[in-house]
């Protein structure tokens, strides 16, 4: 029996390895190559798709491998399954774009335009962050190990960003912040 739940998860792992390799390549190049940054942004969106699937059903039968995958996704994407569980899995699939769904797409209007997109991202971002903090905090007393595990993912991401900023601030902005923000905004927008 394979450690992976599905053979197709090899594609996801290959994709994550390529995204990681692209980051390492760019970081080690002397200058910024815009086509590679654009590719990183596109791959950040794809990483979000993998994260979405991993939040619904983890890739591995083996818990330690799922933990490593969680940390890997956090480093590549900037958020983890901890943010998808309260906002998407436990909320969106429960309310399905009806009142109570924090991802309600027609909160302001049925029209598809830039203004509604900006409002959707701004309001959704506030709702998402609040839901994630409440979700993580809910484990503090009942399941402290889970609480610290979820918190460790956030801390790992911010330590990664902080170290990158200390080493090369411009590279941290272009190779970490830009693709991660693009990936999140593109995912929320689709």
Stretches with model-predicted labels:
Residues 1-46, 50, 67, 75-177:
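Non-catalytic, topology-defining segments of multipass membrane proteins
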Residues 54-55:
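Active-site His/Glu-centered metal-binding helix of metallohydrolases
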Residues 60-74:
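Post-HEXXH active-site segment of zinc metalloproteases
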């Amino acid at each position: 029996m394979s450690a992976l739940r599905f053979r197709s998860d090899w594609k996801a792992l290959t994709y994550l390895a390529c995204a990681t390799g692209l980051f390492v390549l760019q970081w080690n190049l002397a200058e910024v190559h815009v086509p590679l940054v654009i590719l990183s942004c596109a791959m950040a969106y794809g990483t979000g798709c993998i994260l979405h699937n991993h939040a619904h059903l983890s890739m591995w039968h083996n818990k330690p491998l799922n933990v490593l995958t969680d940390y890997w996704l956090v480093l590549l994407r900037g958020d983890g399954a901890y943010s998808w569980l309260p906002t998407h899995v436990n909320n969106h699939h429960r309310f399905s774009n009806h009142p109570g769904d924090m991802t309600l797409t027609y909160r302001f209007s049925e029209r598809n335009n830039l203004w509604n997109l900006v409002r959707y991202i701004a309001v959704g971002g506030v709702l998402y962050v609040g839901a994630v903090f409440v979700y993580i905090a809910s484990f503090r007393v009942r399941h402290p190990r889970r609480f610290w595990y979820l918190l460790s993912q956030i801390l790992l991401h911010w330590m990664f960003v902080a170290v990158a900023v200390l080493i090369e601030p411009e590279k941290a902005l272009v190779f970490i912040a830009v693709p991660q923000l693009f990936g999140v905004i593109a995912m929320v927008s689709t």
